Amino acid sequence: ETVRSHSLSVWTPNVNIFRDPRWGRGQETYGEDPYLTSQMGIAVVKGLQGPEHEKYRKLLACAKHYAVHSGPEWSRHTANLNNVSPRDLWETYLPAFKALVQKADVREVMCAYQRLDDDPCCGNTRLLQQILRDEWGFKYLVVSDCGAIADFWTSHKSSSDAVHAAVKGTMAGTDVECGYGYAYQKLPEAVSKGLITEEEVDKHVLRLMEGRFELGEMDDPSLVNWTKIPMSVVNCKAHKDLSLNMSRQTMTLL
């Protein structure tokens, strides 16, 4: 139980575009510039995951929230964004995600709460399959924002119940469900009803297990170089000072 509580899957960086200063989570982002956001995100992902030539990853970084998620918070569970122009989508909201997938090999992508063109992002085949996997070549893990699958039937009303939501999320490409409701617990029922095949479910389980193998969770800790870093180094004063100094130097006036 102690080991299970120490997750090596970190849900950062937030590469959403900060367009409205009233958005209360804007401080998590890298601003309103898609190029700057892309470059900062690439550096963060590479630093968190470690060198690609290593057998094991330090952590699994996560590009979030995919996509077109920039507040406000109060309407994120019900919003339907159906007026996003193709130019805004491809030149403003998607470049950072594409960069993290293709230039940083980010291991996780988190789908957002709201709907985009009538489909919830975590059940949006165009976003998760056609763009993310088919066009960009992403082959790793998609995780839902916490409670996003439950939103399918509680607030978006795009699903009739938890069983339908579980099938919709899985078939669209969301591998792991976070949060409350846990619709994916209904997948065995969905399989028994013939709504989804066990082979389809296995495909998503395999992606999850591949991530855990990449972290070395299935091997002896002595084989994983990152386990040799002492806790005295983690969050130490030298690293805090470096982070503070970097933050001071990177402030940008647009």
Where in the sequence are the language-model features?
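Glycoside hydrolase catalytic-domain context in secreted enzymes
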Residues: 1-254
